[in-house]
């Protein structure tokens, strides 16, 4: 499952051919999961042709059957997960929710927060804390409130538009000298500084966005993405994980579509962020990708997004090797569960 880090399953499959004197020991006795969970996991992985034959045998006999739930969409799926966890009750750290892509965490975070259930994103950051999401939220906050100096500083040169630290320092100096808020100083600098074309373009962009703040939030963000060519910036700045970041952007658009307007959307974001504040990891539901779940175990595991395009992922279904990697990921997810899946 670590092929994205250049791991190759052939190193395992061809081991005895490369080292004919080697002896193979199969560790097949499983102390973690119940018989029902292992039977389900084995039924998944047995479909793989490229594997060493091995069937886990449970120490824990019996157990409840694995439950399957078919949701109408991702929002209803997140609602079901949150309601089930609320029904089963604390301690919250006995639950894990596993998914294929980082972007899937957003609805889960919001559904759990809406029921007052503390959660944490393991091996990553919460959806609204991801850099590309924070960039777009900063534009929204600035459009609604030009006095938001923190948001102004974040987006001033994101994507890069030729406004460097030296220019920003001069704007701040102007603000101090004239007793102006940074945004007003920036507008004056755009009028009076030499070679201020980048500043003028930025001011015009923000004023364009201000005209959209009372309309649909999704339309605001779509205009922003087009006006800044933000997707192209992500592809150029983050070639290794641009697709993951673009998925987060698409998820943000889906979230924006649910809000009445931009202010309503930012209020919802603030509520989710507030619900994620409580401290100790021990008392929280674990949200994580299947890759981050390797080696961990939980009494109760939810595996979400088991559907064509997500698991198996759309980038992996065109080859046998890719499809089998996806099946291994599903197997890893199922076998994280100790009692219920």
Predicted regions located by residue number:
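Switch/connector loops and helix/strand junctions flanking conserved nucleotide-binding motifs
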Residues: 1-3, 33-39, 46-47, 53-54, ...
């Amino acid at each position: 499952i670590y092929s994205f880090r250049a791991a190759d399953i052939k190193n395992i499959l061809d081991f005895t051919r490369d080292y004919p004197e080697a002896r193979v020991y199969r560790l097949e006795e499983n102390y973690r999961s119940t018989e029902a969970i292992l039977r389900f996991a084995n039924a998944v992985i047995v479909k793989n042709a490229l594997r060493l034959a091995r069937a886990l045998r449970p120490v824990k006999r019996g157990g409840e059957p694995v439950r399957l739930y078919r949701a109408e969409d991702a929002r209803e799926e997140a609602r079901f997960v949150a309601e089930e966890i609320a029904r089963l009750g604390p301690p919250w750290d006995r639950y894990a929710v596993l998914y294929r892509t980082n972007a899937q965490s957003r609805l889960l975070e919001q559904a759990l927060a809406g029921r007052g259930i503390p959660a944490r994103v393991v091996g990553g950051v919460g959806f609204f804390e991801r850099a590309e999401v924070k960039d777009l939220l900063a534009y929204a906050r600035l459009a609604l409130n030009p006095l938001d100096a923190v948001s102004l500083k974040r987006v001033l040169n994101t994507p890069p538009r030729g406004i460097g630290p030296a220019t920003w320092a001069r704007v701040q100096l102007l603000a101090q000298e004239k007793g102006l808020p940074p945004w007003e100083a920036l507008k004056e600098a755009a009028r009076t500084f030499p070679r201020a074309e980048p500043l003028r373009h930025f001011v015009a962009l923000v004023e364009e966005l201000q005209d959209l703040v009372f309309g649909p939030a999704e339309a605001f963000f779509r205009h922003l993405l087009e006006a800044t060519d933000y997707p192209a910036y992500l592809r150029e700045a983050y070639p290794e994980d641009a697709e993951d970041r673009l998925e987060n952007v698409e998820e943000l658009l889906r979230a924006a579509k649910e809000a009445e307007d931009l202010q309503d959307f930012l209020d919802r974001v603030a509520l989710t962020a507030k619900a994620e504040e409580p401290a100790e990891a021990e008392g929280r539901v674990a949200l994580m990708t299947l890759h981050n779940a390797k080696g961990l175990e939980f009494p109760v595991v939810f595996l979400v997004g088991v559907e064509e395009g997500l698991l198996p992922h759309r980038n992996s279904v065109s080859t046998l090797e890719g499809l089998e990697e996806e099946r291994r990921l599903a197997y890893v997810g199922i076998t994280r569960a100790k009692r219920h899946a």
